[in-house]
Amino acid sequence: MQKTDLFMARTEGYWNYRVPGILCTANGVILATVEARTGAGGDWDGNDILLRRSLDGGISWQPPQRIVAHDTYGPGPVSNFVLFADADGTVHALYCHAYNRVFYLASGDGGASFSPPVEVTGALNAFRAEYPWRVIATGPGHGIQLRGGRLVVPVWMSDGSGTEFGAGKLGHRPSEVATIYSDDGGTTWQCGEIFAHSDGQIINPSETLAVELDDGRVLCNIRSESPQNRRLISVSPDGAGQWSKPLFDEALLEPVCMGSLLRLRQPNAEGRGVYLFANPDNLENELTPPGRNLAHDRKRLSVKMSVNDCTTWPISRVLEAGPSGYSDLAEAPDGSILCIYERGMLNRMTDTASVAVARFDRAWLSAGE
């Protein structure tokens, strides 16, 4: 196990760094992204997107480069940056501005440069026939490419009526979850079905992870603020529609925090897919005042393994015992696993001290606690 701090709070003119993403391209380049936050580091402060690249499987990293700057878009943050690794080597990306505009860009050189952004918000307006969203966000984390070539990423949306951010700012609650997808390599995007609703049984479903199962179905693992304090699971035959009723997974605790989900390239000895899930595996309230949206301490970041299509998670190991929040997972060319995550805290739980990347192998994970 090796841990490296990639972005340190209070450096390079930013207050802190949050919402990390990580991806291994088809050509083996590792890309690590963060929201570089100004102001007080809140969701609505001025955020840029920074990227670091690794050409040796996550051992060493090139200096940060700013790939999206919020001040070129007007007031509001740039956020929820999502990367996709295309089998042809292309890197696709989606991100949001001010939680009401969505943009697409791409890289053909492993993230060394990106195309000019193209706004795709118009495609997402189709959701308004069912839900009058005023706030919308992609991911975060990474999107996926299905074996048939389709690009899929979950999105969450809100009517903005929540008051949690104060006067003049749209709320992120109540919220709903859907997917968007592209069948032409990111050129155009389509709306999937809205499949997780704030309906009283489920409370404020939001940041969602997608993975392709052994038989080609797509599973979504959903954050929510439901009192069951468990992750929600829904499955679709194609990542777009016919979603199953979301059900709580008793094995996966929900402290109200984004998680991460990854299918490894190589199956196990029986030919079954190997899946990893990471999130703060904790329901204590030593660091977080109880009662706020049922949130619990973001600590004890753990990685779990499944070999039966995410049905059970018999293997689990703590990666970071202390404060640790949002994360994302990738697999390096040599099979090493990379987990990028929010590490440590300063003034409050969401004032992240650093964004770090941990590098480990299956043997470390299988060894357990």
Which sequence ranges carry the predicted segments?
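Asp-box/BNR beta-propeller blade signature and adjacent active/binding-site loops
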Residues: 1-369
